[in-house]
Amino acid sequence: MSQSPSLHQLQELNPFLRRHLGPDATEQQAMLNALGIASRNELIEQTVPPDIRLNRPLDLPAALDEQAALAKLAGYAEQNQVWTSLIGMGYHGTITPTVILRNVLENPGWYTAYTPYQPEIAQGRLEALLNFQQMVIDLTGLPLANASLLDEATAAAEAMALAKRVARNKSNAFFADEHCHPQTLSVLKTRAEGFGFELIVDSVDNLAKHSVFGALLQYPDTHGEVRDLRPLIDQLHSQQALACVAADLLSLVVLAPPGELGADVVLGSTQRFGVPMGYGGPHAAYFACRDDYKRAMPGRIIGVSRDARGNTALRMALQTREQHIRREKANSNICTAQVLLANIAGFYAVYHGPEGLQRIAQRVHRLTFILAAGLEAKGIKRLNQHFFDTLTLNVGGAQAAIIESAEAAHINLRILGRGHLGVSLDETCTEQTVLRLLDIFLGVDHGLEITALDQLALPEGIPASLVRRTPFLAHPVFNLHHSETEMLRYLKQLENKDLALNQSMIPLGSCTMKLNATSEMIPITWPGFAQLHPFAPAAQAAGYKAMIDELESWLCAITGFDAICMQPNSGAQGEYAGLMAITRYHCSRHQPMRTLCLIPSSAHGTNPASAQMAGMEVVIVDCDNDGNVDLADLKAKAHAAGERLSCLMITYPSTHGVYEEGIREICDVVHQYGGQVYMDGANLNAQVGLARPADIGADVSHMNLHKTFCIPHGGGGPGMGPIGIRAHLKPFVASHPVVPVPGLDPNNSAVSAAPWGSASILPISWMYIAMMGPQLADASEVAILSANYLASQLGAAFPVLYRGRNQRVAHECILDLRPLKALTGISEEDVAKRLMDYGFHAPTMSFPVPGTLMVEPTESESKAELDRFVEAMLAIRAEIDEVQQGNWPAENNPLKHAPHTLADVLGVWDRPYSLEQAVAPSAHVRQHKYWPAVNRVDNVYGDRNLFCACVPVEAYR
């Protein structure tokens, strides 16, 4: 009889599970042994409160292997019909240069990095973002730009908030041109609702009739009209109001920059700079403003500073103005935004350079001119006198026949009322595209030829007064890398400066830097997902609908909620969307007075900022000495609020890294007083398969798909923050003005520009759940095991600040460095910088408690990597002891000088510790050395000498 294993024995039940989990069964058992317990189940019983446990498998389909999951998802992609979409409205066909596609978008060195809070190990993407800012500064004609926002519509809402904060006109009204994109107007409506602003949507011809603190103008407008904005801007300035302009970035290559026309704020999308439409996202918005408003600007700003040796170094500037610092005083809850996509757009400009961009923009405009000339020659009336790439046409009774012809040619046009059609050309269009359009509008026997039309002496589409005269992108970085060889090497040089997950663990607490598996990432560039316009007819997006519906059903099964709203395109947007749904719910019950939001003192800064944006008054609830919500204080404040109580925002497990025993009672108290419970989903990775937010008592919660469900952080975005909702809140979530959500009131205004947010990255989370199935619980259990293992190994050297039941932590733990700082002067920042010399990104610094490090290892890190981190931390503790014992001076030791660079090696060495101790402090580092690009960055200098544009090349030498 054969002794070889049977086919059944050789068939793995869940082959992806062992790829996703870092520690194998043997390593897990060794970690359990170190904790003095026998099994993972015993650990979970000791850690998770029994009254919230989900004591059954998740109701999910059995896990698929990688090939089967890819095949099923490919079937969905094939159901999507990729037509030529000439709808416009802020979304356009574009060509992603393949050198950027392969070496940035598909490169884990770029997409697995985190927000550059530790600039010494992020100089590559900081330089890329500085390039992005310089591109925006040059094209808009304004002196200051940020490093991206979420999308054009939310950027417009941010502009409105900025205008209210800084304008001298104290009106409570904001004006929006009725010819702005409809999705932008909808998001403005939502934001104005939360802030209590009056939003006036009207013709710009009536602007002078209104007293406003600011206005939004579209350039060119949604129908393609290129209007001289100077008279409108002068009118606004005469009443001390701000002029905000939403501008098509490619058009600014040939149009006069809005800054030169007098605009105070310019914003828009960079999607058509090489970023696929992706059924709505993700795309990087841009935002530029006058220098006077720098402290009111939303989002991250990259600035130039210097390091400890005086060399040029980049960093995130003016961070004290951000939401996590200003909390309930913030005008914005924007956290990180769309860094990966901003980098792609910036690299698109680097690769093409000013001449390349001019060629692209002029070609798009010329094709549009030729189309306009042909249609005009045959009597079709154009409604916009001037244009860049968009024509709005009056075709009268021929509209239906033209639409039918366009559909037969697989071309999507913008369908407007009253016999009007819109057509927007883009970089992907050719002469053949124009000929097909002439056939569609005029019939195949029109007799027109492209060459002849190109030679017609007709009025130009852009008036002479609005032709761009100002040079742009003169900096060398936009003029040196136009061959693929040079571009490839430039991208690699930048990548090598950064530390990402493809090199080492990133143990950032509250960030869940887990594996972003290759099989999860591959589908996002498939044309069936990448090339769809978000406003394409539903029949062309059947595959997207099937995939999203299935993902929503899975997320409901995982969380216990009744429905999912996919529109929020970040975690902070999810918070805002959920709170707005709560506000609308209370108003529907004739309880508009319910505006008070209770938030624990430990909450992330986005929580109070989001509540303030939703029109709520924030009341802080104390935490006790164990880091838990003070139940007595909660009860007292809920009672005091009474009928004014709107909701409680709470993170679970808590931001202190423990499962609070009283979470059910906390929810019950809020419900007793008529409030709703908003559960921040930042720590959902410690709940999946073990507990469900809705079962615990949450009414609404956002899910960070870029944490728990494997969408990569991209160096600071993209992300997705869909919300799960109980049935009673479902009628009040965001809909969309262009693609209404079935079953919702179409008057429910939007929170994001696209109906399903950043839809093209949803396949990542779909793949993760499809390949894990009910074994998602294993990921949560191993994440908890890894965190407890680190706590046990490090607790003697660095006290763990908070522990839960049985002295266990959840999926992360807080190491308290304050006693050591008091003894030695060595701070949490010194330890964070010294970890770079050991090849690690630091844990989260000083959140949620100043003077601490919060460590989250995730389930994806092997025991060997965890042990390497433990070795590094214990070695650092030994170095601190050397300082404490007086063997090294308090200000002249490896921690105070960290990180160490090649410049230190090449310079004069006169420090009281060896060069080897400085740059090669462990055996692993001696074999796998990562060199920080700069020494410690001087933050104070950078803010006092703010400079947020590209510096001369000589500065890097």
UniProtKB/Swiss-Prot annotation:
GO terms for molecular function: glycine binding; glycine dehydrogenase (decarboxylating) activity; pyridoxal phosphate binding. Keywords: Oxidoreductase, Pyridoxal phosphate. Its cofactor is pyridoxal 5'-phosphate. One of its GO terms (cellular component) is cytosol. Gene3D superfamilies: Aspartate Aminotransferase, domain 1, Type I PLP-dependent aspartate aminotransferase-like (Major domain). Its EC number is 1.4.4.2. The keyword Oxidoreductase applies. It comes from the Bacteria. One of its GO terms (biological process) is glycine decarboxylation via glycine cleavage system. The keyword Oxidoreductase applies. The modification N6-(pyridoxal phosphate)lysine is found at residue 707. It catalyses: N(6)-[(R)-lipoyl]-L-lysyl-[glycine-cleavage complex H protein] + glycine + H(+) = N(6)-[(R)-S(8)-aminomethyldihydrolipoyl]-L-lysyl-[glycine-cleavage complex H protein] + CO2. It is an enzyme of class 1 (oxidoreductase). Pfam families: GcvP2_C (PF21478), GDC-P (PF02347). The glycine cleavage system is composed of four proteins: P, T, L and H. Belongs to the GcvP family. The glycine cleavage system catalyzes the degradation of glycine. The P protein binds the alpha-amino group of glycine through its pyridoxal phosphate cofactor; CO(2) is released and the remaining methylamine moiety is then transferred to the lipoamide cofactor of the H protein. This is Glycine dehydrogenase (decarboxylating) 2. It comes from Pseudomonas putida (strain ATCC 47054 / DSM 6125 / CFBP 8728 / NCIMB 11950 / KT2440).
